[in-house]
């Protein structure tokens, strides 16, 4: 399964072990740059938008309208996608005053401080791309930018009682601020690849890979 992985200065936070596990369960990882490529690579079966610093490159990401359109069209066609933290921000309507992909509602804004910082346990309220209802995985949040809407498919719980809804998730999407390590629950990686196999959506088949 060909999984497009955003890798550039804006999207650079990945657990290498998590990428290795995706390879182990059948993924071919295809790097691309939302900053400089004009469209998604051809023939993708899934998409992984990791964390990073999209707020520092918001103007450049926004100016690359062809890539924004390519990503949105792929997601609207049902391409399975994981978007963590910075990747989630990229899918919203805007980062600050800079329009983004616009697949998810709401804008991202500078909170002026760390927002919901620390380790949490994510528990799914509904079946989704990565697990069934009740499935859980350790995760963490570390970000100074927040979003007007952050989703409610999962509940994030701190070790000492505080909890909140988070993450937009469907049968083909996980998009939210929490980062997780696939080895904390390898079934999440297996389920993601299964969705990619079942979907066999091929995004950007009429496009040329920018690399």
Cite the ranges covered by each PLM segment.
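Catalytic beta-strand/loop cores that center a nucleophilic Ser/Cys/Thr
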Residues: 127-171
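Glycine-rich, charged/polar anion/phosphate-binding loops
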Residues: 31-36, 89, 123-128, 160-163
